[in-house]
């Protein structure tokens, strides 16, 4: 366990397509990581799941894979969780941002991006930093009453096309800031 607290002991699950072993550990807040060993499984997902066939064809949206998952933690907790990912998961800190790099006139945050080494799995960990007002991290921690996953980012080769296709399926998005916001970005 390398110091991690167990959420789920290794459990063997089987069906006619083979077997998987699932286990899990606790991380920050109520966040858990579930591990699935599928090397002896040929089914569509996990035992008990069946492939679903639609009676209509849909156009692909362009979503490709999960790019990263961001975790928000409390004041002075980021380095503790960086060490956790290093010690428990063997991850490396391959990118860091301090409050001088991620800030506005009123708020700031700090972030360290943890990765499995080849960049396929990325977990940025954010913590609040001092500012004139509460940072988005503090607002998150207050609203959700503690640490947790802020967002999961999905990769696409064409964001305009993907958003258009997702909107046509009823997915709602936040409004984009006005052009003045983007013009001011280089000066921040």
PLM region descriptions:
Residues 59-60, 139-143:
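Short helix-capping and inter-helix turn/linker motifs at the boundaries of alpha-helical repeat units
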Residues 64-65, 145-149:
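Short glycine-enriched loop/turn motifs at secondary-structure junctions
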Residues 82, 143-144:
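Extended non-catalytic domains of envelope/secretory-pathway proteins
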Residues 85-91, 146:
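Long hydrophobic segments that form regular secondary structure
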Residues 148-159:
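C-terminal, well-structured subdomains that either form a transmembrane helix-short loop-helix hairpin
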Residues 2-73, 77, 83, 95-132, ...:
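Vicinal oxygen chelate
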Residues 133-138:
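A short, acidic/glycine-rich surface segment
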């Amino acid at each position: 366990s390398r110091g991690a607290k167990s959420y789920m002991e290794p459990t063997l699950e089987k069906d006619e397509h083979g077997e998987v072993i699932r286990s899990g550990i606790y991380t920050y807040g109520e966040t858990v990581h579930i591990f699935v060993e599928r090397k002896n499984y040929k089914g569509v997902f996990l035992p008990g799941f069946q492939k679903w066939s639609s009676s209509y064809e849909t156009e692909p949206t362009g979503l490709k894979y999960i790019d990263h998952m961001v975790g928000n933690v409390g004041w002075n907790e980021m380095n503790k969780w960086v060490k956790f990912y290093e010690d428990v998961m063997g991850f490396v800190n391959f990118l860091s941002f301090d409050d001088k790099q991620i800030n506005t006139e009123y708020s700031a945050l700090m972030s360290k991006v943890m990765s499995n080494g080849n960049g396929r799995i990325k977990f940025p960990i954010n913590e609040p930093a001092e500012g004139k007002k509460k940072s988005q991290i503090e607002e998150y921690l207050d609203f959700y009453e503690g640490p947790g996953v802020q967002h999961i980012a999905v990769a696409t080769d064409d964001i305009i096309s993907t958003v258009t296709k997702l909107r046509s399926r009823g997915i709602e998005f936040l409004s984009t800031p006005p052009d003045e916001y983007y013009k001011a970005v280089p000066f921040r």
